[in-house]
Design a protein with these regions (language model features):
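Ligand-binding "clamshell"
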Residues: 1-6, 117-129, 190-195
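Mature extracytoplasmic/periplasmic domains
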Residues: 144-205
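Periplasmic-binding protein-like
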Residues: 74-83, 89, 121-147, 191
């Protein structure tokens, strides 16, 4: 969307945001954001300490776009997050990995690459993209037009795009590679066909990419988020 035809950017890695849950602590099917408002999981829910990620969860649960600029939709999402707050153990970012691995929480909102890492450490963990949809994101490389060493930058990107290097990078960072040739080199069939690393079109059907909404809307989101955190 930001670069039609990939004329100016090269995709580096991609992924989704979803729910990581401990199968020994959650005894029901997990397919909806709704479970993050279940009172029986009080003090065992981890939310992202991020305004767009947390509002994205609430907005999608309510059936809205995670890029909504509608003030009523945003205030409804804010109220939903305020209602949820007594159930939340903590608002975290990277800490969600360690807390879920050690069994300190039953449910956590997490990035898919982090989910793959946590599963390696704790096989009782499972990841799902809720049916209402979520955020699908992509990190890309670009070279500024005034780059003083353009040829070096191009060489670096070309190196990272080599299938063998892209494979090594994927195995290290555990975030999905968009390099199809690198994916074919993955020897572990479970990883190569993983719905976490490589979800199919049906799983992504209701997902969206965050877009920049402008400074004024960003300020509105931030004000609403501050009230959630201080409630």
């Amino acid at each position: 969307q930001f670069d039609p035809g990939n004329l100016y950017s090269v995709p580096y890695c991609w992924g989704t945001v979803g729910i990581l849950y401990n199968k020994t602590m959650v005894d029901e099917p997990v397919d909806s954001w709704e479970i993050l408002w279940e009172s029986k999981y009080r003090d065992s829910i981890l939310m992202q300490d991020s305004v767009r990620d947390s509002f994205g969860v609430a907005l999608k649960y309510l059936g809205h776009s995670l890029n909504s600029t509608n003030i009523k939709e945003l205030t409804d999402a804010q109220q939903l997050l305020i209602t949820q707050k007594p159930l939340v153990q903590a608002y975290v970012i990277d800490q969600v990995r360690d807390k879920m691995i050690s069994g300190e929480a039953a449910l956590g909102v997490i990035y898919s690459g982090e989910a793959i890492y946590t599963q390696r450490e704790n096989p009782d963990l499972e990841y799902v993209i809720p049916k209402e949809g979520s955020n699908v994101w992509i990190d890309s490389w670009v070279i500024p037009k005034n780059a003083p060493h353009q040829e070096n930058a191009e060489a670096s990107i070309n190196f990272l795009c080599r299938p063998d290097i892209a494979l090594m990078n994927f195995e290290y960072i555990t975030y999905s590679t968009p390099n199809e040739a690198a994916r074919e080199l993955i020897q572990d069939e479970d990883i190569r066909d993983s719905h976490i690393a490589f979800p199919d079109e049906a799983e992504l059907a209701n997902c969206e990419t965050f877009t920049y909404l402008g400074s004024q809307v960003d300020a509105t989101y931030n004000d609403l988020w501050k009230k959630v955190k201080s409630s």
